Swiss-Prot record:
This is 6,7-dimethyl-8-ribityllumazine synthase. Belongs to the DMRL synthase family. The active site is at H98. 5-amino-6-(D-ribitylamino)uracil binds at Y30, A61, L62, E63, V90, V91, I92, N123. Catalyzes the formation of 6,7-dimethyl-8-ribityllumazine by condensation of 5-amino-6-(D-ribitylamino)uracil with 3,4-dihydroxy-2-butanone 4-phosphate. This is the penultimate step in the biosynthesis of riboflavin. Pathway: Cofactor biosynthesis; riboflavin biosynthesis; riboflavin from 2-hydroxy-3-oxobutyl phosphate and 5-amino-6-(D-ribitylamino)uracil: step 1/2. GO terms for cellular component: cytosol; riboflavin synthase complex. It catalyses: (2S)-2-hydroxy-3-oxobutyl phosphate + 5-amino-6-(D-ribitylamino)uracil = 6,7-dimethyl-8-(1-D-ribityl)lumazine + phosphate + 2 H2O + H(+). It comes from Xanthobacter autotrophicus (strain ATCC BAA-1158 / Py2).
Amino acid sequence: MVTTRKESAGDASLNAGLEGARVLIVEGRYYEALADELLAGARAVLEAAGVEVEVITVPGALEVPIAAEIALEAAEITGNAVDAVVGLGVVIRGETYHFEIVAGESARGLMDLGMAHALPVGNGILTVDTEAQAWERARVSEGNKGGGAAEAALTLLRLRRRLEA
């Protein structure tokens, strides 16, 4: 029998295992207003979970995984460990092949980051055909994909900590 349940990171019982956690948000701000909405959703989830949040801003989605890697290396040097990463951004299809490159490489970069570091990563980089689709997914009151990416990272972090205990 398979059961499913929707969990909110704001529930106190679900915050167990997140004590002292530090989560890095790397946001591509090519579409400023959409970036604000994605960040608001992610921040709300992470703050409700009681984790420390750091935000790094980069120009666009393609730079998100690179900036995350740079931040992880710096964190190792300084001893200020990062427990999870949330990547945020928006890629809207245009008339050139550039969409496929940015969409695919930003997603691959985040997956590679998670695999190389055994690190919980939430991918909140929207890849859509239109700006209207982006808004439907980004708005906290609708799709809240920023919040969803943060919840994904927290879920993986809880799993990691539970398995390592």
